[in-house]
Amino acid sequence: EVFESPAFSTHGYVMVDYIAGLQAQLPYNLRPFPVFTSAARNKLNAYLKEGGSLFLSGSYVGSDNVHTAADRDFIEDMLKFKYDGSARIDSTDTVNGLNMQFSIYRKPNAVHYATLAPDAILPASNKAFTAFAYGGGQGAGVAYQGKTYRTLSISFPFECIRDKDVRNQAMKAILGFLVKR
């Protein structure tokens, strides 16, 4: 809510880390809980056009953004990825990317929330590339390095990476990509 507020400015921020977790517009939600409200989408759009960098993570970053043309246009034209269905349940315990393979929380447990049905996403531009893939090969992350801005979107919550050292190593690599000019 603070991010969406007109009083909050992204000016001066080198990068935005947008954590969507399990956010999604679902029929059983007690209140609206989209990955992007129109206010957030507009603010991110302006921020990226000014040369910012965005790291987006969440289980439903694709599927929650196919309902309207504005949603689809934002993820495809600005973030440079497109929804490719749900990731197969038999291939999503492991993720490959950044020259490593790691496990994510997929089943309910006492330690951490789990991503039960994450999206699969693919590049929507020939200037974007698959940066992460689930164990079965479906796309789990798309990176884009444009002339004025950069994005890295992953279709699982970053915080669901099981191993702390791997999380730290992954974040270091992600930051290196997003803030390097």
Where are these regions (language model features)?
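Residue-level detector of buried hydrophobic side-chain packing
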Residues: 44, 51-54, 144, 148, ...
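Short amphipathic alpha-helical segments and helix-helix/interface helices
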Residues: 37-45, 118, 171-175
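Helical hinge/lid and interdomain linker segments adjacent to catalytic or ligand-binding clefts
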Residues: 1-72
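Active-site-proximal beta-strand elements of phosphoester/diester hydrolases
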Residues: 130-131, 151-157
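Short, solvent-exposed loop/turn elements at domain surfaces
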Residues: 139-141, 160-165
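Aromatic-Pro/Gly-enriched surface loop or interdomain linker
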Residues: 1-22, 59, 144, 149, ...
